[in-house]
């Protein structure tokens, strides 16, 4: 079974994912920005009622591929992805965040809707919680001070793209060829299959 992080499939190139698979020691250690993001997420969570849990992980499987995705905040009626923003965020960061949400929502829409507290939190002493969310559950992106609702019109198209990317990550030549065609174009390629709008 080849296992991938959904976030990595959205934010990293095939070559980078392949390299880190062979050399995990080269991954960067958490930065101050990561710590700031975690604090921002906790602050957001403190303002939201009826939270089932934070960092609740789902798993999508297809043949010999397994893709894990972690949802920041899960409520009975919505899932919230939280991104901290310092200053004026570049457009690519918003697009990457929206695409990440669209991918996660697509997997949930296709029935991979069982979410459990991530193991790293359980190992820290947090209670393990689990929920089967509705496949059509609302998905919200909090991007700094802005909020967006994510809607997916063709979950299969989005999932199939990232399945092809995951398969390409298993071989250096396939990874190189995939990146040559798709690197930095993921949002453009998939933009017909999802939409988002600001909410208040």
Spans of model-derived segments:
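Alpha-helix boundary/capping residues
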Residues: 13-17, 24, 108, 165, ...
